[in-house]
Design a protein with these regions (language model features):
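Ubiquitin-like/PB1-type beta-grasp interaction modules and other compact soluble beta-rich domains
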Residues: 1-64
């Protein structure tokens, strides 16, 4: 399916946000995900289905000092 991730079009085979994060090798505990301009809470990653042409913004949390 075609997804727009952080402004870039990608062709990926994933059903849910949790699948997408696995494909992108991202840990759910260190990311924030927006799906079609709606924030998705971590506890819903396993149940939130993706559709063709969905737009996602994925932000990784990085600690520092």
């Amino acid at each position: 399916m075609k997804l727009i991730i952080n402004g870039l079009e990608k062709e990926l085979n994933c059903e849910k946000i949790s699948d997408l994060l696995n494909i992108l090798d991202l840990e759910k505990d260190i990311v924030a995900v927006e799906l079609n301009k709606n924030i998705v809470h971590r506890e819903k990653f396993n149940n939130t289905k993706l559709n063709d042409n969905d737009k996602l913004e994925i932000v990784t949390v990085v600690g520092g000092g």
